[in-house]
Amino acid sequence: MNRMKKAVSLAAALVLMLGCACAFAAGNGRIRYEGEGFATPEDALACYMEGLKNLDFEQMMSAFAWETQMEHYDLRVFLERIGAYQVTMRPRMPSINDFMFSANVNVLRFYQADLIYRSIEAYILGDDDPAKAATGSVTFESNSDDVGAFLEKFENGRLEKLTQMTNIRFLSPDEITDNKFSVGPNPEAFIRQTACYGADEAVNLVGVADVGDETLYCYPTICRYGDRWYLVSVSSFTSMIIGVSNLNQAFVCGPGSLADLIR
């Protein structure tokens, strides 16, 4: 009986090893995360916004260039523009081999996903967001139901309200920056900021939609590689001009004007 168990275990291990080997051989050791890209920047942004409406995180992530971005990314240009190397930067190490390329792709995905995650949290919690507390955190009393009461705040219906999103439309950066995007040193600054992406073309586009009695805004950087468009970042030169906080980099949604929402 023991011999049979050992034989079965060995066979299972061999099947698993062969399966893994075949999977890596087929993809040259890489998993490819990005989709086929989009014909226009509007199509790319619509995919992102519709993913939010559908409460489909993977659909939102499918709007981005992951591998293509890292294949063209110029870290030297980025560091020369910033003038510093900081451990908060993502990505921050060169893709000198397949291992580092894969590491950078995954770090990039984590970073953008975390920005979306943070904006969703801020949207759901509103004034109860820990970032709005003086301490920057929420503390719980022992021997109380503070934790339960806090967790219930995530079931307030805000997330589900996003499924009411309608009338997706697009604005130029100038339409929400009082034309600041296209005047003075800003056009050249935009070119410098986006040069690190190594894209054939980079644009900022503002997505707007109605969510019940509220308005949603997002303002990503979108790039063209060849004839395909992708998001490369949820943040942008536009969001920098209007002063979007770290809470709302991926999107902001609420009543009132954009200026009111990001204040």
Regions found by a protein language model. Name each.
Residues 6-25:
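Sec-dependent N-terminal signal peptides of Gram-positive bacterial secreted proteins and lipoproteins
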Residues 26, 124, 261-262:
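Short, aromatic- and cysteine-enriched interfacial helices/patches
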Residues 22-62, 66-73, 80-110:
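Short, low-complexity N-terminal intrinsically disordered segments enriched in polar/charged residues
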Residues 86-183:
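Low-complexity, serine/threonine/proline-enriched polar segments
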Residues 63, 75-76, 237, 244:
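Residue-level detector of alpha-helical recognition elements and their boundaries
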Residues 1-3:
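N-terminal secretory signal peptides that target proteins for export/translocation
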Residues 154-156, 160-263:
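Low-complexity, intrinsically disordered terminal/linker segments enriched in charged
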